[in-house]
From Swiss-Prot:
Positions with a binding annotation for substrate: T13, A14, V15, G16, K17, T18
Record field: catalytic activity: adenosine(37) in tRNA + dimethylallyl diphosphate = N(6)-dimethylallyladenosine(37) in tRNA + diphosphate
Protein name: tRNA dimethylallyltransferase
Protein species of origin: Streptococcus agalactiae serotype III (strain NEM316)
This enzyme's EC code(s): 2.5.1.75
Family membership: Belongs to the IPP transferase family.
Site (Interaction with substrate tRNA): T102, R128
HAMAP family for this protein: IPP_trans
Cofactor: Mg(2+)
GO biological process, alphabetically ordered: tRNA modification
Pfam families: IPPT
């Protein structure tokens, strides 16, 4: 069966994924699927760096504002709903363009996971990270202990097999129905960190404090409140730290998050990054997309 072609724009926060995704959607008749675990929440617009109303008018966005703030959202939900969105976009004769930085969600979708029951996102993530920390010798020893045989011995297949063994029918693996063009965006580290710092300042100017205070007053313990952009401000609202310290912590956590995102995409999804500082980088990406879509 012919695989469905997907374009995926990935990379660290603040690198410019949203703008590129919209440009590709306009150029190649596409619609965007958000691959971000926080942008699903209604009323949380600033802290999640959600595409603005003006940006959403330029290209239709799926999986934005699909949950109330007090609802949970998991990798199970994302895979299920992203597949529906992909089918919807394809039925219109358009190209699905997935834009986001939540690596676990994207990897689970692209690598053929389908879920027979709900797997707790944090449980899956913790188990995968535990396996990733093992040496090759220890990892393959675990395969032997559980009598797991895989046709080709490499770390990715080994980890996938152990996940399937642990979670059973809740996390099944089959051949992916998708042919994915992964476009990884990156920038010089200091340039990226400076952009992150400026974006946090802009978020504060645009009303992040009011948005976070509303969450603090109404839903301080829900899953959404644990996201970067909100949890750092809660100690300020409870008068434990001054605002300047809270904002500095938010910038620091965002920079660290960007570093973790890069590590995930490099090590777990084999993404080759394009530097946004390169001359004509968007034109290079468009040529790559055009070649991908025209190939059989």
């Amino acid at each position: 069966m012919r695989k469905i072609k997907l374009i995926a724009v990935v990379g660290p926060t603040a690198v410019g994924k949203t703008a590129l995704g919209i440009e590709l959607a306009k150029t190649f008749n596409g619609e965007i699927i958000s691959g971000d675990s926080q942008q699903v929440y209604q009323k949380l617009d600033i802290g999640t760096a959600k595409a603005s109303k003006e940006e959403q008018e330029q290209a239709y966005h799926h999986l934005i504002d699909v949950r109330e703030v007090n609802e949970n959202y998991s990798v199970y939900d994302f895979v299920k709903e992203a597949k529906v969105a992909i089918d919807t976009i394809i039925s219109k004769g358009k190209i699905p363009i997935i834009v986001g930085g939540t690596g676990l969600y994207l990897q689970s979708l692209f690598e053929g996971y389908h879920l027979g029951g709900e797997v707790n996102q944090e449980t899956l993530k913790a188990y995968r990270e535990k396996l990733e920390s093992l040496s090759d010798e220890d990892l393959f020893e675990k395969l032997t202990e559980q009598s797991i045989v895989i046709p080709q011995v490499n770390r990715r297949r080994a980890i996938r097999a152990l996940e399937l063994a642990k979670f059973g029918n809740d996390l099944q693996n089959s051949e992916s129905p998708y042919d994915v063009l992964l476009i990884g965006l990156n920038d010089d580290r200091q340039v990226l960190y400076d952009r992150i710092n400026r974006r946090v300042d802009l978020m504060i100017d645009n009303g992040l404090l009011d948005e976070a205070k509303w969450l603090y007053d109404n839903y301080p313990s829900v899953q959404a409140s644990r996201g970067i952009g909100y949890k750092e401000l809660f100690p300020y609202f409870s008068k434990q730290i001054p605002l300047e310290e809270a904002v500095d912590k938010l910038k620091q956590n965002t920079r660290r998050f960007a570093k973790r995102q890069l590590t995930w995409f490099r090590n777990r999804m084999n993404v080759e990054f394009i530097m946004v500082g390169e001359e004509n980088y968007q034109q290079k990406i468009k040529r790559k997309v055009s070649d991908f879509l025209s190939s059989k």
